[in-house]
């Protein structure tokens, strides 16, 4: 009987531990991952606003460079590479949601013309597969196959992200034409400053919500601070909460102004966007060009041969 109770107790403890661990993982992952390009899906039907601004900039407030490389022209129903480059100093460390320092992750959103989409695995060459590695791309929406997102992924390994893209064929898709098309890209490195719900992360500056005298700074047991500010005009106490991982710039007894920074800026990342152009080329036009160039070359050859023949005739006449 006692053995049965012991086994039952052990089973309950294991179940409880697994449940708690799972909850901690979900909460931590949500905190760390929020505000990456893939999470814009939750709040925006289209990642590119009418102004041309990509919505990831709403959460990643610092402006950083991003670049995209695509071929100038592609043929219908062919696979090509779109390489997104997200450069940054690999030595940098960012503040994580738990307040510790860690490596930067990166993410990207690629907005292709209608009809262009992620290439199916059986169409991707071994060379491109090697560049992709273990990356897993997703459509922004099930009905928007031309918009792809990736991230967060380790920045030290994937500061260059290769998207395998399948070009459409106007012969089978009447909505596609042989034209020049724009491609838009957005890329970030590091965590955002604002979560999708509008709240601040611990990767940004915290400012004073009122002016006055700092009467008390309480260091919280799990990290972070509670700063008590006494409003000089009415004596009202205001408590500003500072999350863990941030460095204070103020001290007790100090007089501060409204919106004065209470912490240093921990953000070392940022977001950038760019664009490129690609031409969907008609194979018949290419064949026509090749035929024209071949004709020119043949004409030049015949002209040279004719000239040599004429020179021989002239030379023979002079000998007579």
Curated annotation (Swiss-Prot):
Keyword Repressor: no
A Pfam family it matches: Apocytochr_F_C
Annotated compartments: Plastid, Chloroplast thylakoid membrane
Membrane protein topology class: Single-pass membrane protein
Signal peptide: 1-35
Cofactors named for this entry: heme
Gene3D superfamilies referenced in this protein's UniProt entry, alphabetically: 2.40.50.100, Cytochrome f large domain, Single helix bin
SUPFAM superfamilies in UniProt: Cytochrome f subunit of the cytochrome b6f complex, transmembrane anchor, Cytochrome f, large domain, Rudiment single hybrid motif
A single GO molecular function term of this UniProt record: electron transfer activity
Free-text remark on how the cofactor is bound: Binds 1 heme group covalently.
Record note on quaternary structure: The 4 large subunits of the cytochrome b6-f complex are cytochrome b6, subunit IV (17 kDa polypeptide, petD), cytochrome f and the Rieske protein, while the 4 small subunits are PetG, PetL, PetM and PetN. The complex functions as a dimer.
Function: Component of the cytochrome b6-f complex, which mediates electron transfer between photosystem II (PSII) and photosystem I (PSI), cyclic electron flow around PSI, and state transitions.
HAMAP family associated with the record: Cytb6_f_cytF
Name of the protein this chain belongs to: Cytochrome f
């Amino acid at each position: 009987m006692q053995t049965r109770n012991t086994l039952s107790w052990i089973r309950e403890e294991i179940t409880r531990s697994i449940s708690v661990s799972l909850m901690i993982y979900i909460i931590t992952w949500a905190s760390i991952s929020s505000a990456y390009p893939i999470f814009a899906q939750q709040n925006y039907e289209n990642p590119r606003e009418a102004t041309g601004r990509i919505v990831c900039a709403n959460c990643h407030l610092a402006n950083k460079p991003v670049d995209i490389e695509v071929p100038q022209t592609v043929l219908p129903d062919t696979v090509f590479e779109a390489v997104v480059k997200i450069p940054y100093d690999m030595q940098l460390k960012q503040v994580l949601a738990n307040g510790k320092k860690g490596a930067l992750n990166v993410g990207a959103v690629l907005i292709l013309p209608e009809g262009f989409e992620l290439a199916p695995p059986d169409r991707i060459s071994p060379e491109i597969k090697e560049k992709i590695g273990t990356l897993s791309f997703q459509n922004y929406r099930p009905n928007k196959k031309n918009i792809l997102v990736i991230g967060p992924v380790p920045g030290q390994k994937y500061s260059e992200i290769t998207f395998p893209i399948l070009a459409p064929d106007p012969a089978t898709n009447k909505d596609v034409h042989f034209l020049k098309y724009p491609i838009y890209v957005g890329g970030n490195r590091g965590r955002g400053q604002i979560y999708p719900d509008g709240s601040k992360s611990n990767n940004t500056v915290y400012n004073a919500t009122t002016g006055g005298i700092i009467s008390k700074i309480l260091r919280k047991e799990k990290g972070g601070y509670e700063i008590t500010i006494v409003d000089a005009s009415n004596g009202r106490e205001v408590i500003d909460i500072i999350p863990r991982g941030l460095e204070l710039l103020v001290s007790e007894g100090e007089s501060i102004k409204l919106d004065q920074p209470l912490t240093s800026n921990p953000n070392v990342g940022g977001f950038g966007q760019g664009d490129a152009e690609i031409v969907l080329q008609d194979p018949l036009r290419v064949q026509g060009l090749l035929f024209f160039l071949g004709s020119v070359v043949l004409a030049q050859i015949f002209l040279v041969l004719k000239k040599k023949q004429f020179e021989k005739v002239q030379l023979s006449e002079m000998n007579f």
